[in-house]
A protein has these predicted regions:
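Proline-centered flexible-loop/turn and helix-kink motifs
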Residues: 21-22, 209
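Short loop/turn and capping residues at structural boundaries
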Residues: 28-29, 169
Length: 266
């Protein structure tokens, strides 16, 4: 969606909701809030709507209140309160419908209150966080590094025995959820404000382009090669730390090599 169409959609959404007296307010979140990150052609609309008590479910199950609702091709109930909506154009909405009391179940970083008939600004402010993710303790780092090494090993073993789907998820996803928070705290950067304090995988490459490029290059390899490449990054960035589990990393590398030979034999 181009920038003009993106803004127009947001304006029409707000106008329609403001005209409905059952609606108490609207909050745009993430890049839709247009604060630290401006939406681009790949951005969805991320928002939540606060309604009078008792009418929330109607907004979650009927979509006439959405702009261009006749062009919706898919709706998915993601959580009790939240949905994903897909339009024929490929544009997507991610939103939740709350009453005022339910707002406390949400999480926010960037946000803007589009309109508020009472209480929403206070409720949103109470759940919003603009502070960086909490600093990891030495024990946290040790646990995350240990988990990353173990997950690489488990993933490689599954790939080697023919469980490629499961193994690749361990290598390409589970491992990074433990590794990236450690790298974000350890690596130097002129400005870490672009990092997402709710999702450690977001915008990593923007803040750490060199290491981000290494990780992406590893992920573009075959599964065992990806595991090897991620292990290379772990040892390169963290290997000189006093508490780095050098022997464990060497063991994992040995297992990865064995798994690569086993996979090739199949």
């Amino acid at each position: 969606m181009n920038p003009d169409a993106y803004l127009d959609f947001a304006r029409r959404l707000q106008a329609g909701l403001e005209a409905d007296k059952r609606v108490l307010g609207l909050v745009f979140a993430g890049s839709s809030a247009q604060q630290s990150h401006i939406p681009d052609e790949w951005s969805d609309h991320d928002f939540f709507v606060v309604t009078a008590d008792g009418v929330q479910e109607g907004f979650r199950t009927s979509y006439e209140w959405l702009p261009d609702h006749e062009q919706i091709v898919l709706s998915v109930r993601e959580t009790e309160h939240g949905l994903k909506i897909l339009y024929a154009s490929g544009h997507m909405l991610e939103f939740a419908i709350f009453n005022l009391e339910e707002v406390g179940r949400a999480r926010l970083n960037d946000y803007t209150v589009a309109f508020d008939r009472g209480g929403l600004a206070v409720a949103a402010g109470a759940i919003a966080s603009s502070v960086p993710a909490p600093e990891l303790t030495p024990a946290d780092i040790q646990r995350h590094v240990g988990m990353a090494l173990c997950l690489l090993l488990v993933g490689a073993g599954r790939v080697a025995r023919g469980e490629g789907i499961s193994g690749q998820v361990f290598i390409r996803s589970h491992t990074l959820h433990h590794l990236l928070p450690v790298l974000e705290q350890t690596l130097p950067a002129a400005d870490k404000s672009a990092l997402d304090n709710l999702d450690p995988l977001r915008r990593f490459e923007r803040v750490f382009p060199a290491v981000g490029a290494q990780i992406n290059a590893a992920l573009n390899r075959d599964a065992i090669g990806a595991a090897m490449g991620i292990l290379d990054v772990i040892e390169q960035v963290l290997g000189d730390k006093a508490d780095f589990p050098t022997a464990a990393a060497a063991t994992v590398r040995s297992v990865l090599k064995r798994a690569a030979h086993s996979e090739a034999a199949h």
